[in-house]
Design a protein with these regions (language model features):
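Short S/T/G/P-rich N-terminal loop/turn motif that feeds into the first structured element of a domain
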Residues: 1-49, 85-99
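Short hydrophobic/aromatic beta-strand micro-patches
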Residues: 8, 55-57
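An amphipathic, aromatic/His-enriched active-site/gating alpha helix that lines ligand/cofactor pockets
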Residues: 35, 57-89
Length: 99
């Protein structure tokens, strides 16, 4: 299952600005990259907006929650299950969106 994570933090909690918070980011990123139940698909940062966009693949949400929880000390996150657009278009073509 694919999950898209959007993490947002403020300038006051930014790990790039506050060295003591950098350790939290490093530990969270390492957990995402090394947890066997999680595969990082893509990860991007919008540094001027203090936002991370991370897409991961995992069997369920529990492993993602465990790996991402430390980052909640720096800001907030939205985690959404997502699917490839090509897969959605196939479903729509099969009538999945019709009542």
């Amino acid at each position: 299952m694919l999950f898209h994570i959007t993490h947002t933090h403020s300038h006051e909690t930014c790990p790039a600005v506050h060295v003591d918070r950098r350790k939290t980011l490093d530990e969270c990123w390492e957990a995402l990259r090394t947890t066997p139940e999680i595969r990082v698909v893509e990860a991007y940062a919008a540094p001027l907006d203090h936002i991370f966009h991370i897409t991961v693949e995992a069997d369920d949400l529990a492993a993602v929650v465990k790996a991402m929880s430390p980052l909640n000390a720096l800001g907030s996150a939205q985690t959404l299950p997502v699917m490839p657009l090509d897969d959605l278009l196939l479903l729509v073509g099969e009538g999945a969106s019709r009542p």
